[in-house]
Amino acid sequence: MGKINIKKGDLVQVITGAKAERGGDRGKQGKVLRVFTESNRVLVEGINRVTKHTKVGQSQRGSKTGGIEIVEAPIHISNVALVDPSTKKTTRVGYRLETVERDGRERVTRVRFAKSSGKDLA
């Protein structure tokens, strides 16, 4: 697959899957918690929540662990789109080169920007 334009901390929206009225996540927005580059998946806060059954055991401190937990599962990167922070709508990502003066030297850095509004992304 191509380049991954989504980074940790970005706001994304689910663009495919079951509609929210039917219990799905399409149209929902959330913050990216982690990016799995090897499998082209992202972990999004509050999206793709699944029930996980863990075996009962003891932690290092002696407290009981295990039971039924609801956790987020990774979702494929092609199923989400980046949200422009200024317009709150989905957008594509572009890159531009900017010269920044740091420590008395000029350095060229790549800056991500939202193609819909042209504003820089964090």
From Swiss-Prot:
GO CC annotations on file: ribonucleoprotein complex; ribosome
Gene Ontology molecular-function annotations: rRNA binding; structural constituent of ribosome
CDD domains linked: KOW_RPL26
InterPro entries per record: Rib_uL2_dom2, Ribosomal_uL24, Ribosomal_uL24_KOW, Translation_prot_SH3-like_sf
Any matching Pfam family: ribosomal_L24
Membrane-spanning intervals of the chain: none
Identification of the protein by name: Large ribosomal subunit protein uL24
Subunit: Part of the 50S ribosomal subunit.
Disulfide bonds listed in the record: none
GO BP term (any one): translation
Task performed by this protein: One of two assembly initiator proteins, it binds directly to the 5'-end of the 23S rRNA, where it nucleates assembly of the 50S subunit.
Lineage: Bacteria, Bacillati, Actinomycetota, Actinomycetes, Micrococcales
Gene3D superfamilies: 2.30.30.30
Keywords recorded for this protein, A-Z: Ribonucleoprotein, Ribosomal protein, RNA-binding, rRNA-binding
UniProt superkingdom: Bacteria
Provenance organism: Renibacterium salmoninarum (strain ATCC 33209 / DSM 20767 / JCM 11484 / NBRC 15589 / NCIMB 2235)
Family: Belongs to the universal ribosomal protein uL24 family.
PANTHER family, per the entry: MITOCHONDRIAL RIBOSOMAL PROTEIN L24 (PTHR12903)
Keyword field contains ATP-binding: no
HAMAP family named among the record's database cross-references: Ribosomal_uL24_B
